[in-house]
Curated annotation (Swiss-Prot):
Region described as Disordered: spans on this chain: 34-62
Keyword Cell division attributed: no
BP terms from Gene Ontology: aromatic amino acid metabolic process; serotonin biosynthetic process
Pathway(s) per entry: Aromatic compound metabolism; serotonin biosynthesis; serotonin from L-tryptophan: step 1/2
Positions of Fe cation binding: 318, 323, 363
Domain ACT: 65-140
Protein name as catalogued: Tryptophan 5-hydroxylase 2
Organism: Macaca mulatta
Keyword Signal applies: no
Family designation: Belongs to the biopterin-dependent aromatic amino acid hydroxylase family.
Subunit structure of this chain's protein: Interacts with DNAJC12.
InterPro entries linked to this entry: ACT-like_dom_sf, ACT_dom, ArAA_hydroxylase, ArAA_hydroxylase_Fe/CU_BS, ArAA_hydroxylase_sf, Aro-AA_hydroxylase_C_sf, Aromatic-AA_hydroxylase_C, Trp_5_mOase
A GO molecular-function descriptor: iron ion binding
Annotated catalysed reactions: (6R)-L-erythro-5,6,7,8-tetrahydrobiopterin + L-tryptophan + O2 = 5-hydroxy-L-tryptophan + (4aS,6R)-4a-hydroxy-L-erythro-5,6,7,8-tetrahydrobiopterin
């Protein structure tokens, strides 16, 4: 069963005050060296290679302006300018004036050309020796949009998942000729209703409650009853832990189809995941992008009642019975999110590999517990026949290795030719982390849980922001450990 997936302009500063002619000899010499470096930057080198032309360097450097404040003392300026030389930042223009803030200080204006990385590193060093007064934004390469123009689009904030959710490849009302409900006009109209509900939903809204028909509830009941018999001996312990909680808090019963809004609120409290309605199949890229935000796209329609134990597509029985119980587990939730994060901005080829790994883990994965094979994949936990088959001697079971698993063919209408087993979710997560390192991407990403947005880690400044958050968390942990030690008398 196929899962439903599958950021200078150089604004001239008001230049007033005295010139740099008052600089000490050492400063004159340093300025001369900097000017010489700039003049020689376009000449041929010793090997006869031509310097880059203006057009060639336009995409590698931009004009930048910085104003910093120094104490009016001998040697202060030379120390600051030496940093420009060390970072190979070419100065185009430099001026000074008495500080408007403090009479004992001098403000230095520098108009220069450099690359983004060099400039960011320069600023970090200048902060230790000077006071940064102002920075002008850079030209050319410094716009984030231009940097990412060759990277496939991905949502940068959770509300942009609306765009992903509405890019449905195949609507739930468009049934194939071999679909059990193809000739049932009443069923087709019902499916259209669920499509309209999903397409009208936007982030932040409560999920519309559905009044399921008697036949839909009956179909749900058959699936619920038959699968419940197998779970004690076939499902992993994490599943068995959360299933009773869903019965208690979300109305998981044979005679009741749970509402997505109740399920979403439950998951939010347990693991930070939420669900949102979707009208049908999404591309692997759009579906995995949701996981990056801990959002699971979930169908609301129910399979045709003529064959309750079969569905050619993921329906709400598959989502609620297969996926939701494990999405309530924090470790499994993190494993799911990391697959999603790895997909953001990745190539089509890499996304397909990630989607295949998703298929054979989160959809059809097995794990070992107490020496026995147990199922954690939603495709298994929502399919009576394949759940029995996967844990039988007839099934081909292999150790999960993303490098080989991503090459396995995904089968939709028949049982899988192979299933992949992990010792634990933690082991599977670590293997996926190693595999994600092979994905070609000019940056890393970080999910900010406070703003529910994706931060692009591409320079020292962006990484510094994340480190600040981690340092705060680490301080909390250290404080807790110290209090424990005091309590225990250690």
């Amino acid at each position: 069963m196929q899962p439903a997936m599958m950021m200078f302009s150089s604004k001239y500063w008001a230049r007033r005050g005295f010139s740099l002619d008052s600089a000490v000899p050492e400063e004159h010499q340093l300025l001369g060296n900097l000017t010489l470096n700039k003049a020689n930057s376009g000449k041929n080198d010793d090997k006869g290679n031509k310097g880059s032309s203006k057009n060639e360097t336009a995409t590698e450097s931009g004009k930048t302006a910085v104003v910093f404040s120094l104490k009016n003392e001998v040697g202060g300026l030379v120390k600051a300018l030496r940093l420009f030389q060390e970072k190979r930042v070419h100065m185009v223009h430099i001026e000074s004036r008495k500080s408007r803030r403090r009479s004992s200080e001098v403000e230095i204006f520098v108009d220069c050309e450099c690359g983004k990385t060099e400039f960011n590193e320069l600023i970090q060093l200048l902060k230790f020796q000077t006071t940064i007064v102002t920075l002008n934004p850079p030209e050319n390469i410094w716009t984030e949009e231009e940097e990412l123009e060759d990277v496939p689009w991905f949502p940068r904030k959770i509300s942009e998942l609306d765009k992903c959710s509405h890019r449905v490849l195949m609507y739930g009302s468009e049934l194939d000729a071999d679909h059990p409900g193809f000739k049932d006009n009443v069923y087709r109209q019902r499916r259209k209703y669920f499509v309209d509900v999903a397409m009208g939903y936007k982030y932040g809204q409560p999920i519309p409650r559905v009044e399921y028909t008697e036949e839909e509830t009956k179909t749900w009941g058959v699936v619920f009853r038959e699968l419940s018999k197998l779970y004690p001996t076939h499902a992993c312990r994490e599943y068995l832990k959360n299933f009773p909680l869903l019965t208690k808090y979300c109305g998981y019963r044979e005679d009741n189809v749970p509402q997505l809004e109740d399920v979403s609120m439950f998951l939010k409290e347990r693991s930070g995941f939420t669900v949102r309605p979707v009208a049908g199949y999404l591309s692997p890229r759009d579906f995995l992008a949701g996981l990056a935000y801990r959002v699971f796209h979930c169908t609301q329609y129910i399979r045709h009642g003529s064959d309750p134990l079969y569905t050619p597509e993921p329906d709400t029985c598959h989502e609620l019975l297969g996926h939701v119980p494990l999405l309530a587990d924090p470790k499994f939730a993190q494993f799911s999110q990391e697959i999603g994060l790895a997909s953001l901005g990745a190539s089509d080829e890499d996304v397909q590999k990630l989607a295949t790994c998703y298929f054979f883990t989160i959809e059809f994965g097995l794990c070992k517990q107490e020496g026995q094979l147990r199922a954690y994949g939603a495709g298994l936990l929502s399919s009576i026949g394949e759940l029995k088959h996967a844990l039988s001697d007839k099934a081909c079971v292999k150790a999960f290795d993303p490098k080989t698993t991503c090459l396995q063919e995904c089968l939709i209408t028949t049982f899988q030719e192979a299933y992949f087993v992990s010792e634990s979710f933690e082991e599977a997560k670590e293997k996926m982390r190693d595999f994600a390192k092979s994905i070609t991407r000019p940056f890393s990403v970080y999910f900010n849980p406070y703003t529910q947005s994706i931060e692009i880690l591409k320079d020292t400044r962006s990484i510094e922001n994340v480190v600040q958050d981690l340092r705060s968390d680490l301080n909390t942990v250290c404080d807790a450990l110290n209090k424990m030690n005091q309590y225990l008398g250690i």
